[in-house]
Amino acid sequence: VNPTVYSIEKNGMDHADCIMCVSELTRRTVINEYHQDPRKVFAMHNAVYPLSQELLDIPRPEHPKEKVVTFLGRITMQKGPEYFVEAAALVLQRTRNIRFVMAGSGDMLNAMINLVAERGIADRFHFPGFMKGKQVYEVYKNSDVFVMPSVSEPFGIAPLEAMQCGTPSIISKQSGCGEILDKVIKTDYWDIHAMADAIYSL
């Protein structure tokens, strides 16, 4: 924890009359780690807007010979990208008829490219870079499975967006959105074997 950031955050909370959190997970953190009065801390989950007709009309291509499994987000420690790569390596020991996509940018991108090469799975992995707007929904619709292996996620909007596109999702138990999503598979972010089993089963 960065003490300067913590001090600024706590000072703001100390002077607030009401603190709105995006999940019960975050609410507990605010109460326990920032020592706030539970009576002024409330959880209000995030939501997504209904898709526009333009996004609804994005075609969903079929992948009869290969499945596509996607990670989409910041490629940083908080998002757990290395667990996605390690789980992918385990899945590819069982079958080669899968392609993995890591869409996004971040300070761990080069490390993930190197890790993929070390695991010998570069021919099954794609790094298309940062996505925005309509591109994000095109990626979701091109995916057979979406994975969010976050180490720490106050909420996490991406699985809701993926599910809007009809893409089944696997999320970490450490994600706040898991409090409202019951039609997803949940694993611990560090349990790459459970994550690999979930990917393979879908």
What are these regions (language model features)?
Residues V151:
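Aromatic "clamp/platform" in nucleotide-sugar-dependent glycosyltransferases that forms part
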Residues V184-H193, S201-L202:
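Conserved acidic donor-binding segment of nucleotide-sugar-dependent glycosyltransferases
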Residues P168-I171:
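Short hydrophobic beta-strand element within catalytic cores of glycosyltransferases
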Residues L25, A47:
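Carbohydrate-associated surface elements
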